[in-house]
């Protein structure tokens, strides 16, 4: 498993903080945004990260010397200053278990705990599309979130799914919204407020300033407006879900 760590992100929406990219092999097949051609492939997929410069960078991770092995990446995270804000995975997901071919949607618990331990005392956050119907996946995410230093958000693709994942009680939740969704007043079917990503709605806002996705015990769902090359197609799919 290879990971690339950029110490100062050049993405204005993220801000000048460390950001990582994990090779596409980490993405679970349960991710509904994945291309039929596989993770990291732009053809027919809806994942914003598969397109443009980020997509080109992502597809090179683990090739031609780009990125480092997981253990070296974790050592680099451990060396970050105390309270350092950082984003894990502008593309990619949690490390995947390869103990059995049937386990392709099961996270690698050992590697996940290695990361959460390395991030102790930091202010990291990430997102996962792994299937939370798996008891192991739920247990790993819950334990990762018990460690002070890395917040794992569960990614949902409808407001009703956001409710379901929030009710698990193991992690904060984010949801993908159609690109033309209102910026205020959205609630889930169970009444949870949805805060549309401030970096998408405010010109002077970035992840480095907002930090909302890093808050573990928040009551709100963070909503991300569909964006990127496939946003129109993805928005059409999302509009029919709730």
Regions found by a protein language model. Name each.
Residues 1-242:
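Class I S-adenosyl-L-methionine
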């Amino acid at each position: 498993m290879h990971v690339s760590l950029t110490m100062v992100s050049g993405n204005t929406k993220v801000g000048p903080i460390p950001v990582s990219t994990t090779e596409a092999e980490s993405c679970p097949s349960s991710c509904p945004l994945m291309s039929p051609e596989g993770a990291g492939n732009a053809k027919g997929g809806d994942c914003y990260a598969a397109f443009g410069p980020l997509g080109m960078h992502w597809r090179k991770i683990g090739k031609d010397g780009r990125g480092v092995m997981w253990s070296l990446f974790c050592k680099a995270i451990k060396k970050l200053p105390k309270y350092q804000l950082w984003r894990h995975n502008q593309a990619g997901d949690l490390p995947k278990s390869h103990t059995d071919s049937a386990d392709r949607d099961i996270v690698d618990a050992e590697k996940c705990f290695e990361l959460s331990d390395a991030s102790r005392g930091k202010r990291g956050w990430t997102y996962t599309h792994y299937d939370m119907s798996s008891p192991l996946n739920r247990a790993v995410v819950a334990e990762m979130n018990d460690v002070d230093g890395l917040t794992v958000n569960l990614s949902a693709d409808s407001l009703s799914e956001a409710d379901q994942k929030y009710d698990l009680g193991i992690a904060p939740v984010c949801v993908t919204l159609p690109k033309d969704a209102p910026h205020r007043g959205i609630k889930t079917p169970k009444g949870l407020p949805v805060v549309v990503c401030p970096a998408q709605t405010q010109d002077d806002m970035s992840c480095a300033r907002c930090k909302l996705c890093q808050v573990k015990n928040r009551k709100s769902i963070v909503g991300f407006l569909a964006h990127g090359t496939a946003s129109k197609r993805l928005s059409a799919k999302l509009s029919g879900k709730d």
